[in-house]
């Protein structure tokens, strides 16, 4: 299997992703001639980056889908030994300014989630990074019900942003998706709008999928595979 080459079709991408299943991160790193970090404290994005590299993703840090020519976003999911997600899933940054006129249909959240290639990764802390296994890939698009849940949450959360009610946003808002600060530290500051329409400085906010939502995606895939 040729790694690090951009796939030309959805079928080719899925075949390559499924070929990775069963390898450890250490084995994949060896094939790509790269070093596995001793821990992920300073390399939090390493797992996602090595999977992107192996599959030939080209977006990098650009705000587009990882396989824009195929309309597919790549997401790794760290899972425990029971196959359950260990953390929420980052979707994209929230537009804190210049957000007038954005609808669900034109939102970056819908763009990112319309077609997703999920790659489960074993991530129990007791297991060394190099020994963690890559799981079977899942190519997913939201069902009608899932999209309605996402849309409802997006519209509710965006209302807080547009009305300048950032101080009222907390992790409890949203059924399947939440808004949380995105930044390595308190020095990560961006522009936003307050309730009076004035520009202020605040922490960047990002949309995240809640763990039960991604757990359901994994569970549905397993049931269909049986």
From Swiss-Prot:
Keywords, ordered alphabetically: Cytoplasm, DNA damage, DNA repair, Endonuclease, Hydrolase, Nuclease
Subcellular location as annotated: Cytoplasm
InterPro entries tied to this protein: DNA_mismatch_repair_MutH (IPR004230), DNA_rep_MutH/RE_typeII_Sau3AI (IPR011337), DNA_rep_MutH/T2_RE_sf (IPR037057), Restrct_endonuc-II-like (IPR011335)
Gene Ontology biological process terms in this record: DNA modification; mismatch repair
Claim: DNA repair is one of the keywords in the record: yes
Statement: the UniProt record of this protein carries the keyword Nuclease: yes
Cellular compartments per GO CC: cytoplasm
TM stretches of this protein: none
Principal localisation: cytoplasm
GO MF entries: DNA binding; endonuclease activity
Protein family membership: Belongs to the MutH family.
Function of the molecule: Sequence-specific endonuclease that cleaves unmethylated GATC sequences. It is involved in DNA mismatch repair.
Name of the protein in question: DNA mismatch repair protein MutH
High-level lineage: Bacteria, Pseudomonadati, Pseudomonadota, Gammaproteobacteria, Pasteurellales
Gene: mutH
């Amino acid at each position: 299997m040729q790694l690090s080459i951009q796939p030309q079709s959805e079928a080719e991408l899925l075949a390559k992703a499924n070929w990775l299943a069963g390898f450890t991160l250490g084995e994949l790193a060896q094939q790509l001639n790269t070093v596995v970090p001793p821990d992920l404290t300073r390399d939090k994005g390493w797992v996602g980056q090595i999977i992107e590299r192996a599959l030939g993703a080209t977006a990098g840090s650009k705000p587009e889908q990882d396989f824009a020519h195929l309309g597919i976003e790549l997401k790794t999911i760290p899972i425990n030994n029971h196959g359950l997600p260990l953390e929420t899933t980052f979707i994209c940054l929230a537009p804190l300014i210049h957000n007038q006129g954005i609808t669900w249909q034109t939102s970056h959240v819908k763009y990112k989630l319309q077609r997703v290639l999920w790659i489960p990764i074993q991530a129990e802390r007791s297991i060394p990074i190099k020994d963690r296994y890559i799981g079977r890939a899942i190519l997913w698009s939201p069902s009608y019900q899932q999209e309605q849940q996402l849309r409802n949450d997006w519209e509710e959360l965006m209302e807080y942003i547009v009305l300048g009610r950032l101080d009222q946003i907390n992790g409890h808002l949203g059924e399947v998706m939440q808004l949380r600060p995105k930044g390595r530290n308190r020095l990560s500051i961006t522009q936003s709008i307050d309730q009076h329409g004035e520009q202020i400085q605040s922490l960047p906010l990002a949309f995240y999928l809640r763990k039960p939502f991604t757990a359901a995606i994994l569970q549905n895939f397993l049931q269909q595979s049986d």
